[in-house]
Amino acid sequence: MASSKAFGWAAKDASGHLSPFHFTRRQNEADDVTLKILYCGVCHSDLHTVKNDWGFTTYPVVPGHEIAGIVTKVGSNVTKFKEGDRVGVGVIVDSCQECECCQQDLESYCPKPVFTYNSPYKGTRTQGGYSDFVVVHQRFVLQFPDNLPLDAGAPLLCAGITVYSPMKYYGMTEPGKHLGVAGLGGLGHVAIKFGKAFGLKVTVISSSPNKESEAIDVLGADSFLLSSDPEKMKAATGTMDYIIDTISAVHSLVSLLGLLKLNGKLVTVGLPSKPLQLPIFPLVAGRKLIGGSNFGGLKETQEMLDFCGKHNIAANIELIKMDEINTAIERLSKADVKYRFVIDVANSLSSSNM
């Protein structure tokens, strides 16, 4: 297969340290869209992958699956996009397109996904958005609404859809209902914004008292519940209709279940490193539901982007240069970011030190 020279930053071993890296991309074919990458969000998955925390990283690896940019070339069969379009690429760049999941526009649940980076694909391996350009099948390219900024919109392609999809699927959108958002990070801060746009009462549940002002005054939550205060947790028993749990650290589910009303729903989207204990009694006694969710399919992700454009929803970001990525990864490991790092790829990659 013909290829084109590309440039980005890659991790070359499990130290997770990223450095400049020359590699090749496949050339644009009939169904492909080539985009110049302007911005790329920094996701927790990037951190886990560069350090091989999940045990399946193949080095060298260029991370990044929150990609926003401009179309520079389209293949002869491409009808949805044209040069100059503002577009994005999320977590996957291909799927089998034949299974039941793919036929239902749920490519994120396909048993044979091709991830945007670190996946075998057509005799090579995919590389992500910490780079100058990418070539993607048109089915896996998303259109940005004109009023949605590319830099603050990029994290929506993973963090945004990861909370939007379960809120829609599990019916956590009824105006006037009470939503608890457990954890205030990259996922949680977007969940607050979606909740308010759906007309919900939103309470942030966090063990960090210093996050109260940020949750209410900056992000627009209605209230704050300090989960490390037993008395406040007891007082909030049975007050919430839904909880979306974005916490990635090991934590108690029983305390969250106690906050739910009869028929309440707890949906987990965080990925703790160790299994959580599942308490059955409160599920049975309160006819409560606990569920999970992956990121959404392409149709739903486009719906989410359009929703964000309509309601002026974007991530709160800290824009960084490409050569600041190692510091950003270290800070991310300590949850030291409000609330998503985004790399200013187009304005900093070419000037990165070799």
From Swiss-Prot:
Its EC number is 1.1.1.255. Binds 2 Zn(2+) ions per subunit. It comes from the Eukaryota. GO terms for molecular function: mannitol dehydrogenase activity; zinc ion binding. The keyword Oxidoreductase applies. Its cofactor is Zn(2+). GO terms for biological process: lignin biosynthetic process. PANTHER family: ALDEHYDE REDUCTASE. Oxidizes mannitol to mannose. Provides the initial step by which translocated mannitol is committed to central metabolism and, by regulating mannitol pool size, is important in regulating salt tolerance at the cellular level. This is Probable mannitol dehydrogenase 1. It comes from Stylosanthes humilis. The gene is CAD1.
